[in-house]
Amino acid sequence: MTLKSKLLGAVAGVAMIAGGQAATAGGHSEITVAYFLEWPMPFQFAKETGMYEEAMGAKINWVSFDSGVAMSAAMASGDVQISVSQGVPPFVGAVSGGQDLQIVDVAVSYSDNDNCVVASGLEIDKMSAGELAGKKVAVPLGTAAHYGFLKQMSHFGVDVGGMDVVDMAPAEGAAALSQGAVDMACGWGGALRRMKESGNILLTGAEKSELGILVFDATTAPAAFVAEEGEMLAKFLKVTADANAMWADEANQAKMLPVIAKDAGMDETATSETLAGFIFPSVDEQLGAAWLGGGAQDFMGGVAKVFLDSGNIDAALDSYAGTVNTAPLMAVKGM
């Protein structure tokens, strides 16, 4: 199966069941929130200590996923009402395919925590990246890692069409790289840490940023849920912002770290090192021009163009401005 057919299959799948979006939890006294394991964030302290339920007055079912593409499908089916830290590329793929989702806040920025790793035995670095031509690579299609992979290969002049690209979740890619089953693997979080044990990156986070490879995740939700439950969503975002502020105060980190690590399924050292590479923009920063005030929308247009030019999606939206809804985040400022 080709890159395009796999990604379009996922997009078509969410489009076919998009009508189910409205069938969210009746009355919303109970909702389901998607998140990632091995992706430690301050919100997990609030998750584990009941802060969300207390603020929202609703029961929350937390379900872990292995990719943002899977999150989109779950929101389309009505099984998930909010996704925390969904990558921008899978979001762009979903809305470009007709799914009515909206970004409601910037969850995290992490240029150093999403990358591709080349098997150490190949002895390939950025000076010899052209030798990757024809190699086998594990990539979670439709994700931030996929976008970064395409941009890096374009930068190095490597024809992706001539590579053997295999769709693998990051954890699977890390295992395949360690076993010598692939020459390169792309991913994030704990899986990326394991990949680095078997190889080396080509570009640092700073070098990727210079190429325009921005890496950030968003909190997303079906537009129907945002319209129906704006107040509930604002309360969710307020708790998230409070948890981020708590983590920013080093005095709180000793009590928060063990809780976050346990929920993320990681040890405390790995959790601390991963969090050190994360940036959690404040509410005011998120609403500024660099993020939801226009920068994110422009970036999504660029992501769509890369996917369109590479044949991974059939069409892009004329504008992605309508896929961002800042009303709930604006409400947080008044809380």
Protein language model regions, located:
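Short, glycine-/small- and polar/acidic-enriched structural segments
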Residues: 26-159, 164-167, 183-189
